[in-house]
Design a protein with these regions (language model features):
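Acidic/charged, solvent-exposed loop-and-adjacent secondary-structure segments enriched in E/D, K/R, S/T
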Residues: 79-115
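Hydrophobic residues embedded in beta-strands of well-ordered beta-sheets
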Residues: 55-56, 76-79, 129, 145-147
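A mature extracytoplasmic/lumenal domain signature
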Residues: 60-64, 73-77, 82-84, 165, ...
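A short, polar/proline- and glycine-enriched secondary-structure boundary/capping micro-motif
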Residues: 67-73, 90-94, 159-161, 184-187
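N-terminal leader/targeting segments and the immediate start of mature chains
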Residues: 1-50, 54, 65, 191
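Structural motif
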Residues: 51-52, 74, 125
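Hydrophobic lipid-interacting interfaces of membrane-associated proteins
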Residues: 31-37, 63-66, 81-85, 136, ...
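Gly/Pro-enriched, hydrophobic low-complexity segments
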Residues: 118-191
Length: 191
């Protein structure tokens, strides 16, 4: 159900405040699996290092620690490069993505990837809020305490992100990302 007036304003302020909960620099490591549409489960490890939302690096590695791919985000464009183990993992490479001012570290920390402004709000039957501003659609938990999932629309693709089992506003322990037919399941390593 679409919401207007004070509830819509409250929903927008709630989602707009979530990126501020992520304190930079961000450093985190993950273990997980990638499942292509037609293929075997591929285990991997990953790490993110971000000095700021405009200076981020995400590395994907095989289970032996050999680099498969790197994503470098300058706050406007995500460059994707192959690592030495790319061929062994079946990664052929990808063109750069003009994603705009997105933050990969915020997404992996359980916050919206883009700043929130001027959006349409709605409420699900369970009480969760939904907010869409063109580039992203965000969904809260029913108690409206944290981000439960999101969909991002970047040129040439849609990226869906879910945080299954999330119970607090702390960085999520588990993240499921789907992009271009590949589902990545990440588990945040203990710090």
């Amino acid at each position: 159900m679409t919401v207007t007036g004070p509830e819509a304003d409250h929903a927008e302020r709630f989602f707009a405040g979530l990126p501020g909960r992520v304190v930079f620099p961000v450093k985190a490591s993950f273990s997980g699996t990638a499942v292509p549409v037609a293929g075997d489960v591929v285990p991997f490890v990953a790490g993110v290092s971000a000095a700021s939302p405009g200076e981020e690096m995400l590395g994907l590695y095989d289970p032996l620690g050999r680099a498969v791919a790197f994503l470098a985000n300058d706050g406007h464009r995500v460059e994707i490069s192959r690592g030495p183990a790319a061929d062994l993992a079946g990664f052929r490479g990808a063109a750069p993505v003009d994603a705009g001012p997105v933050s990969l570290a915020r997404i992996l920390s359980g916050a919206p990837g883009y700043a929130v402004a001027g959006a349409e709000a709605a409420r699900y039957e369970d009480g969760a809020w939904w907010l869409s501003d063109g580039r992203q659609t965000l969904r809260s938990d029913p108690g409206r305490r944290f981000l439960a999932g999101a969909e991002y629309r970047v040129p040439g693709m849609r990226v869906t992100v879910d945080y299954p089992g999330r119970e607090s506003a702390d960085p999520p322990e588990r993240i499921v990302l789907s992009v271009r037919g590949v589902t990545f399941t990440l588990r945040r390593d203990a710090e």
